Curated annotation (Swiss-Prot):
SMART domains, per database record: Jacalin
Keyword entries, A-Z: Lectin, Repeat
PROSITE patterns listed in its UniProt record: JACALIN_LECTIN
UniProt protein name: Jacalin-related lectin 45
Gene3D superfamilies listed in its UniProt record: Jacalin-like lectin domain (2.100.10.30)
Keyword Repeat: yes
Coiled coil residues, start to end: none
Gene (name only): JAL45
Domain of life: Eukaryota
Length: 396
Protein backbone atom coordinates (compact mmCIF):
# COMPACT_ATOMS: atom_id res chain seq x y z
CA UNK A 1 0.00 0.00 0.00
CA UNK A 2 1.56 3.28 -1.09
CA UNK A 3 0.60 6.92 -0.90
CA UNK A 4 1.70 10.05 -2.71
CA UNK A 5 2.42 13.11 -0.63
CA UNK A 6 0.10 15.58 -2.32
CA UNK A 7 2.44 18.57 -2.04
CA UNK A 8 5.52 18.73 -4.25
CA UNK A 9 7.66 21.58 -2.96
CA UNK A 10 9.30 24.06 -5.31
CA UNK A 11 8.14 25.75 -8.52
CA UNK A 12 5.76 24.88 -11.33
CA UNK A 13 8.23 25.16 -14.22
CA UNK A 14 10.14 22.23 -15.73
CA UNK A 15 9.06 18.84 -17.00
CA UNK A 16 6.95 16.70 -14.71
CA UNK A 17 8.39 13.35 -13.57
CA UNK A 18 7.09 10.48 -11.44
CA UNK A 19 9.29 7.42 -10.87
CA UNK A 20 6.39 5.35 -9.56
CA UNK A 21 6.70 3.09 -6.50
CA UNK A 22 9.17 0.40 -5.49
CA UNK A 23 7.47 -1.07 -2.43
CA UNK A 24 8.22 -4.81 -2.53
CA UNK A 25 9.90 -6.52 0.42
CA UNK A 26 13.32 -6.30 -1.21
CA UNK A 27 12.61 -3.14 -3.24
CA UNK A 28 13.44 0.46 -2.47
CA UNK A 29 15.87 3.33 -2.96
CA UNK A 30 19.46 2.07 -3.05
CA UNK A 31 21.47 5.17 -3.91
CA UNK A 32 20.96 8.90 -4.48
CA UNK A 33 23.40 10.88 -6.61
CA UNK A 34 22.92 14.64 -6.24
CA UNK A 35 24.44 17.27 -8.52
CA UNK A 36 24.75 20.79 -7.12
CA UNK A 37 26.24 24.13 -8.11
CA UNK A 38 26.38 27.47 -6.31
CA UNK A 39 22.61 27.94 -6.85
CA UNK A 40 21.34 24.64 -5.49
CA UNK A 41 20.29 21.23 -6.80
CA UNK A 42 20.78 20.89 -10.58
CA UNK A 43 20.10 17.18 -11.05
CA UNK A 44 19.02 14.09 -9.17
CA UNK A 45 19.97 10.53 -10.11
CA UNK A 46 18.21 7.73 -8.21
CA UNK A 47 19.03 4.03 -8.16
CA UNK A 48 16.04 1.89 -7.22
CA UNK A 49 15.92 -1.87 -6.63
CA UNK A 50 12.94 -3.75 -8.06
CA UNK A 51 12.74 -7.55 -7.96
CA UNK A 52 16.51 -7.74 -7.61
CA UNK A 53 17.21 -5.47 -10.59
CA UNK A 54 18.68 -1.96 -10.38
CA UNK A 55 16.51 0.71 -12.02
CA UNK A 56 18.11 4.13 -12.63
CA UNK A 57 16.11 7.36 -13.03
CA UNK A 58 17.69 10.74 -13.85
CA UNK A 59 16.14 14.19 -13.58
CA UNK A 60 17.97 17.30 -14.78
CA UNK A 61 20.66 17.12 -17.46
CA UNK A 62 23.18 19.78 -16.46
CA UNK A 63 26.78 18.56 -16.27
CA UNK A 64 30.13 20.35 -16.08
CA UNK A 65 33.16 21.17 -13.97
CA UNK A 66 31.17 23.71 -11.94
CA UNK A 67 28.86 20.96 -10.66
CA UNK A 68 29.68 18.89 -7.57
CA UNK A 69 28.34 15.32 -7.57
CA UNK A 70 27.80 13.53 -4.25
CA UNK A 71 26.42 10.06 -3.49
CA UNK A 72 24.30 8.89 -0.57
CA UNK A 73 23.92 5.10 -0.36
CA UNK A 74 21.16 3.33 1.56
CA UNK A 75 21.61 -0.21 2.92
CA UNK A 76 18.55 -1.57 1.11
CA UNK A 77 16.38 -3.45 2.13
CA UNK A 78 17.23 -3.17 5.85
CA UNK A 79 17.56 0.64 5.64
CA UNK A 80 15.19 3.00 3.86
CA UNK A 81 14.60 6.74 3.55
CA UNK A 82 11.86 8.02 5.86
CA UNK A 83 11.83 11.77 5.24
CA UNK A 84 13.44 14.64 3.36
CA UNK A 85 14.29 18.13 4.54
CA UNK A 86 15.03 20.88 2.07
CA UNK A 87 14.73 24.49 0.99
CA UNK A 88 13.26 26.05 -2.14
CA UNK A 89 13.84 29.57 -3.41
CA UNK A 90 13.19 31.94 -6.28
CA UNK A 91 16.00 32.91 -8.64
CA UNK A 92 15.92 36.57 -9.62
CA UNK A 93 18.02 39.74 -9.69
CA UNK A 94 18.55 41.74 -6.54
CA UNK A 95 20.01 45.23 -6.62
CA UNK A 96 21.82 46.64 -3.60
CA UNK A 97 23.01 50.11 -2.71
CA UNK A 98 25.13 51.46 0.11
CA UNK A 99 23.08 51.69 3.26
CA UNK A 100 21.79 48.15 2.79
CA UNK A 101 18.81 49.00 0.56
CA UNK A 102 17.73 46.33 -1.92
CA UNK A 103 15.56 47.14 -4.94
CA UNK A 104 15.41 46.79 -8.70
CA UNK A 105 17.23 49.91 -9.89
CA UNK A 106 19.58 52.52 -8.50
CA UNK A 107 19.29 56.24 -9.19
CA UNK A 108 21.50 59.31 -8.75
CA UNK A 109 20.28 59.64 -5.16
CA UNK A 110 22.35 56.54 -4.32
CA UNK A 111 25.59 58.23 -5.42
CA UNK A 112 26.26 55.37 -7.85
CA UNK A 113 28.06 53.60 -5.01
CA UNK A 114 27.65 49.83 -5.29
CA UNK A 115 29.64 47.33 -3.27
CA UNK A 116 28.51 43.75 -3.84
CA UNK A 117 30.70 41.28 -1.96
CA UNK A 118 30.32 37.72 -3.21
CA UNK A 119 32.25 34.52 -2.67
CA UNK A 120 34.50 33.41 -5.48
CA UNK A 121 32.78 30.84 -7.65
CA UNK A 122 32.50 29.55 -11.19
CA UNK A 123 29.19 30.31 -12.95
CA UNK A 124 28.15 28.45 -16.06
CA UNK A 125 29.37 31.06 -18.52
CA UNK A 126 32.13 33.12 -16.94
CA UNK A 127 34.17 33.60 -13.76
CA UNK A 128 32.44 35.62 -11.09
CA UNK A 129 33.73 38.99 -9.91
CA UNK A 130 34.47 38.88 -6.21
CA UNK A 131 33.77 42.58 -5.69
CA UNK A 132 32.24 45.10 -8.08
CA UNK A 133 32.45 48.76 -7.06
CA UNK A 134 31.45 51.99 -8.81
CA UNK A 135 31.98 55.38 -7.22
CA UNK A 136 31.35 58.95 -8.41
CA UNK A 137 30.96 62.33 -6.72
CA UNK A 138 28.47 64.98 -7.78
CA UNK A 139 29.97 68.10 -9.42
CA UNK A 140 33.40 66.55 -9.95
CA UNK A 141 35.05 66.23 -13.37
CA UNK A 142 38.29 64.51 -14.25
CA UNK A 143 40.29 63.37 -17.22
CA UNK A 144 39.21 60.18 -18.86
CA UNK A 145 41.41 57.16 -18.27
CA UNK A 146 41.09 53.40 -18.86
CA UNK A 147 41.78 51.03 -15.99
CA UNK A 148 42.54 47.34 -16.56
CA UNK A 149 39.65 44.90 -16.03
CA UNK A 150 39.56 42.83 -12.85
CA UNK A 151 38.16 39.31 -12.52
CA UNK A 152 38.33 36.17 -14.63
CA UNK A 153 39.47 35.61 -18.19
CA UNK A 154 36.41 33.74 -19.47
CA UNK A 155 33.44 35.31 -21.25
CA UNK A 156 32.98 37.80 -24.10
CA UNK A 157 34.92 41.08 -23.88
CA UNK A 158 32.97 44.35 -23.95
CA UNK A 159 33.91 48.05 -23.81
CA UNK A 160 31.22 50.75 -23.70
CA UNK A 161 33.66 53.55 -24.53
CA UNK A 162 33.72 57.01 -22.87
CA UNK A 163 30.73 59.29 -22.19
CA UNK A 164 30.05 62.59 -20.47
CA UNK A 165 28.68 60.96 -17.36
CA UNK A 166 26.92 57.96 -15.87
CA UNK A 167 23.29 58.72 -14.96
CA UNK A 168 22.20 55.38 -13.60
CA UNK A 169 23.42 51.83 -13.18
CA UNK A 170 21.80 48.51 -12.31
CA UNK A 171 23.64 45.52 -10.89
CA UNK A 172 22.14 42.02 -10.94
CA UNK A 173 23.11 39.68 -8.12
CA UNK A 174 22.29 36.02 -8.75
CA UNK A 175 22.86 33.76 -5.73
CA UNK A 176 26.51 34.40 -4.78
CA UNK A 177 27.76 36.30 -7.83
CA UNK A 178 27.23 39.42 -9.94
CA UNK A 179 25.32 38.15 -12.95
CA UNK A 180 24.74 41.38 -14.93
CA UNK A 181 25.47 45.09 -15.07
CA UNK A 182 23.43 47.74 -16.85
CA UNK A 183 24.85 51.25 -17.45
CA UNK A 184 22.86 54.35 -18.38
CA UNK A 185 25.18 56.95 -19.94
CA UNK A 186 24.71 60.57 -21.02
CA UNK A 187 26.59 62.04 -23.97
CA UNK A 188 25.46 65.52 -24.94
CA UNK A 189 21.69 65.33 -25.30
CA UNK A 190 21.71 61.56 -25.88
CA UNK A 191 21.08 58.81 -23.36
CA UNK A 192 22.67 55.44 -24.10
CA UNK A 193 22.12 52.16 -22.23
CA UNK A 194 24.44 49.14 -22.29
CA UNK A 195 23.66 45.84 -20.54
CA UNK A 196 26.20 43.04 -20.03
CA UNK A 197 25.73 39.58 -18.56
CA UNK A 198 22.60 37.54 -17.98
CA UNK A 199 19.45 39.64 -18.31
CA UNK A 200 16.94 39.32 -15.50
CA UNK A 201 14.34 38.28 -18.09
CA UNK A 202 16.39 35.15 -18.74
CA UNK A 203 16.09 34.03 -15.13
CA UNK A 204 13.58 31.53 -13.91
CA UNK A 205 11.46 33.56 -11.52
CA UNK A 206 9.68 30.38 -10.53
CA UNK A 207 10.89 28.34 -7.57
CA UNK A 208 13.53 25.62 -7.54
CA UNK A 209 15.06 23.25 -5.00
CA UNK A 210 18.11 24.84 -3.40
CA UNK A 211 19.02 22.15 -0.83
CA UNK A 212 18.14 18.60 0.24
CA UNK A 213 18.86 16.37 3.25
CA UNK A 214 17.72 12.74 3.51
CA UNK A 215 16.97 10.84 6.74
CA UNK A 216 16.84 7.02 6.96
CA UNK A 217 15.19 4.44 9.18
CA UNK A 218 18.50 3.87 10.98
CA UNK A 219 18.43 7.46 12.26
CA UNK A 220 21.15 8.35 9.76
CA UNK A 221 21.14 11.61 7.81
CA UNK A 222 22.91 12.46 4.59
CA UNK A 223 25.05 15.53 4.27
CA UNK A 224 23.27 18.71 3.25
CA UNK A 225 23.22 18.92 -0.55
CA UNK A 226 23.05 22.35 -2.18
CA UNK A 227 22.71 25.75 -0.50
CA UNK A 228 20.14 26.00 2.35
CA UNK A 229 18.66 29.29 1.15
CA UNK A 230 14.95 30.01 0.87
CA UNK A 231 11.80 28.48 2.33
CA UNK A 232 12.22 25.30 4.38
CA UNK A 233 10.08 22.23 3.69
CA UNK A 234 9.82 18.62 4.87
CA UNK A 235 8.50 15.60 2.98
CA UNK A 236 7.04 13.12 5.46
CA UNK A 237 3.79 11.13 5.42
CA UNK A 238 2.06 10.40 8.72
CA UNK A 239 1.27 6.70 9.05
CA UNK A 240 3.59 5.81 6.17
CA UNK A 241 7.18 4.89 6.89
CA UNK A 242 9.19 4.45 3.72
CA UNK A 243 9.89 6.55 0.61
CA UNK A 244 9.45 4.20 -2.34
CA UNK A 245 9.67 6.67 -5.23
CA UNK A 246 10.21 10.30 -6.17
CA UNK A 247 8.27 12.71 -8.35
CA UNK A 248 8.44 16.39 -9.19
CA UNK A 249 9.52 18.73 -11.98
CA UNK A 250 12.93 19.22 -13.57
CA UNK A 251 14.47 21.39 -16.29
CA UNK A 252 17.83 21.20 -18.01
CA UNK A 253 19.86 22.78 -15.22
CA UNK A 254 17.86 22.36 -12.03
CA UNK A 255 15.30 20.42 -10.01
CA UNK A 256 12.29 22.75 -9.93
CA UNK A 257 10.08 20.78 -7.55
CA UNK A 258 10.26 17.56 -5.54
CA UNK A 259 7.66 15.23 -4.06
CA UNK A 260 7.71 11.63 -2.87
CA UNK A 261 5.70 8.41 -2.85
CA UNK A 262 5.44 6.65 0.52
CA UNK A 263 4.49 3.12 1.58
CA UNK A 264 3.93 1.17 4.78
CA UNK A 265 7.02 -0.88 5.62
CA UNK A 266 6.59 -4.59 4.97
CA UNK A 267 7.86 -6.84 7.80
CA UNK A 268 11.50 -7.69 6.99
CA UNK A 269 12.22 -11.23 5.85
CA UNK A 270 13.58 -13.93 8.15
CA UNK A 271 17.35 -13.65 8.52
CA UNK A 272 19.74 -16.60 8.84
CA UNK A 273 22.63 -16.07 11.25
CA UNK A 274 25.92 -17.91 10.80
CA UNK A 275 26.24 -21.16 12.75
CA UNK A 276 28.90 -21.41 15.47
CA UNK A 277 30.95 -24.47 16.42
CA UNK A 278 32.97 -27.07 14.51
CA UNK A 279 32.97 -28.11 10.86
CA UNK A 280 32.54 -31.88 11.29
CA UNK A 281 29.23 -33.71 11.20
CA UNK A 282 26.16 -33.94 8.99
CA UNK A 283 24.28 -30.76 8.30
CA UNK A 284 20.70 -30.35 9.46
CA UNK A 285 18.22 -27.56 9.00
CA UNK A 286 14.77 -27.45 10.59
CA UNK A 287 13.60 -24.68 8.28
CA UNK A 288 11.55 -21.63 9.29
CA UNK A 289 8.66 -21.63 11.75
CA UNK A 290 6.56 -19.00 13.49
CA UNK A 291 8.27 -19.69 16.82
CA UNK A 292 10.59 -22.20 18.49
CA UNK A 293 8.64 -23.85 21.29
CA UNK A 294 10.70 -26.87 22.41
CA UNK A 295 14.31 -28.02 22.26
CA UNK A 296 15.16 -29.90 25.42
CA UNK A 297 12.95 -27.60 27.37
CA UNK A 298 9.49 -26.15 26.87
CA UNK A 299 8.39 -22.55 26.68
CA UNK A 300 5.37 -22.56 28.95
CA UNK A 301 3.98 -19.13 28.25
CA UNK A 302 2.21 -18.15 25.05
CA UNK A 303 4.14 -14.89 24.99
CA UNK A 304 7.51 -16.45 25.77
CA UNK A 305 10.06 -16.75 23.00
CA UNK A 306 13.79 -17.40 22.65
CA UNK A 307 15.88 -14.28 22.20
CA UNK A 308 19.42 -15.71 22.19
CA UNK A 309 21.54 -18.85 22.46
CA UNK A 310 24.84 -18.90 24.34
CA UNK A 311 27.39 -21.66 24.20
CA UNK A 312 30.98 -22.82 24.22
CA UNK A 313 32.62 -25.03 21.61
CA UNK A 314 35.92 -26.74 22.40
CA UNK A 315 37.23 -29.27 24.92
CA UNK A 316 36.95 -30.04 28.58
CA UNK A 317 40.45 -30.60 29.94
CA UNK A 318 41.24 -33.19 32.60
CA UNK A 319 41.06 -32.10 36.19
CA UNK A 320 44.34 -31.91 38.10
CA UNK A 321 45.68 -35.35 39.11
CA UNK A 322 43.08 -37.08 36.96
CA UNK A 323 43.32 -38.96 33.70
CA UNK A 324 41.83 -37.43 30.56
CA UNK A 325 38.24 -38.37 29.96
CA UNK A 326 37.41 -40.55 26.99
CA UNK A 327 35.33 -37.80 25.46
CA UNK A 328 38.08 -35.22 25.86
CA UNK A 329 40.71 -37.43 24.23
CA UNK A 330 38.52 -38.74 21.41
CA UNK A 331 36.87 -35.58 20.10
CA UNK A 332 38.64 -32.63 18.53
CA UNK A 333 35.82 -30.37 19.71
CA UNK A 334 32.23 -30.40 20.92
CA UNK A 335 29.66 -28.25 22.70
CA UNK A 336 30.76 -27.94 26.32
CA UNK A 337 28.07 -25.44 27.34
CA UNK A 338 24.69 -24.44 25.95
CA UNK A 339 21.92 -22.24 27.30
CA UNK A 340 18.83 -20.61 25.83
CA UNK A 341 17.67 -17.15 26.88
CA UNK A 342 14.01 -16.19 26.49
CA UNK A 343 12.20 -12.93 27.12
CA UNK A 344 11.27 -14.34 30.56
CA UNK A 345 14.11 -16.57 31.80
CA UNK A 346 17.19 -18.66 30.92
CA UNK A 347 17.29 -22.43 30.33
CA UNK A 348 20.68 -24.03 30.98
CA UNK A 349 21.03 -27.24 28.94
CA UNK A 350 24.71 -27.92 29.55
CA UNK A 351 26.97 -26.10 31.96
CA UNK A 352 30.65 -25.95 32.84
CA UNK A 353 31.84 -27.75 35.93
CA UNK A 354 34.14 -25.81 38.26
CA UNK A 355 36.25 -28.97 38.65
CA UNK A 356 37.48 -28.75 35.07
CA UNK A 357 39.11 -26.24 32.80
CA UNK A 358 37.97 -25.67 29.23
CA UNK A 359 39.53 -24.50 26.01
CA UNK A 360 37.75 -23.31 22.89
CA UNK A 361 35.45 -20.47 21.85
CA UNK A 362 32.43 -18.97 23.57
CA UNK A 363 29.62 -17.61 21.41
CA UNK A 364 26.24 -15.94 21.57
CA UNK A 365 23.62 -16.06 18.80
CA UNK A 366 21.48 -12.95 19.03
CA UNK A 367 19.94 -10.17 16.90
CA UNK A 368 18.58 -7.09 18.65
CA UNK A 369 14.76 -6.85 18.67
CA UNK A 370 14.46 -10.28 17.01
CA UNK A 371 13.28 -13.68 18.26
CA UNK A 372 14.59 -17.13 17.31
CA UNK A 373 12.18 -19.06 15.09
CA UNK A 374 14.32 -21.95 13.81
CA UNK A 375 17.58 -23.88 14.21
CA UNK A 376 20.17 -25.52 11.99
CA UNK A 377 23.70 -26.84 12.41
CA UNK A 378 25.90 -29.95 12.23
CA UNK A 379 25.86 -33.21 14.21
CA UNK A 380 27.95 -36.37 14.31
CA UNK A 381 28.14 -38.34 17.53
CA UNK A 382 27.49 -35.06 19.32
CA UNK A 383 26.23 -31.59 18.45
CA UNK A 384 29.10 -29.91 16.58
CA UNK A 385 27.48 -26.70 15.38
CA UNK A 386 24.32 -24.73 15.97
CA UNK A 387 22.79 -21.79 14.09
CA UNK A 388 19.46 -20.00 14.29
CA UNK A 389 16.83 -18.20 12.23
CA UNK A 390 15.51 -14.93 13.62
CA UNK A 391 12.72 -12.53 12.74
CA UNK A 392 11.65 -9.15 14.17
CA UNK A 393 9.60 -9.13 17.35
CA UNK A 394 6.22 -7.48 16.82
CA UNK A 395 6.02 -4.12 18.63
CA UNK A 396 9.69 -4.42 19.63
Amino acid sequence: MSKKVTIAYGGSNGNKFDDGVYEGTYDGVRKLIVGEDFHGIVYLKIQYVKNGDVVVKEHGRARGTHITETEFEVKCPDEYITSIWGTCRNDHHRYKSTGGRTFEQLTAADKYDINLAAKMGTPMYWNTVSELQFKTSHGRTSEQFRMPGTGGSNGVSWDDGAYDRLSKLCVGEDAHCVSSVEFHYVKGNDRITHCHGKDSKEHDKDGFISSLTFKTSMNRSSEKFGKPVGTKFQLEAKGFDKIVGFRGRSSVNRINALGANFAVVVVPPVKKLNAKGGVLGNEWDDGIHDDARMITFKLYFNKEYITSVEGHYGKRLAAPNASASAMSSFFTGYMTMLKFNTNRTTYQVLSHSPEYTYEGTSFKLEEKDHKIVGFYGKTEVSLNQIGVYVKPIANA
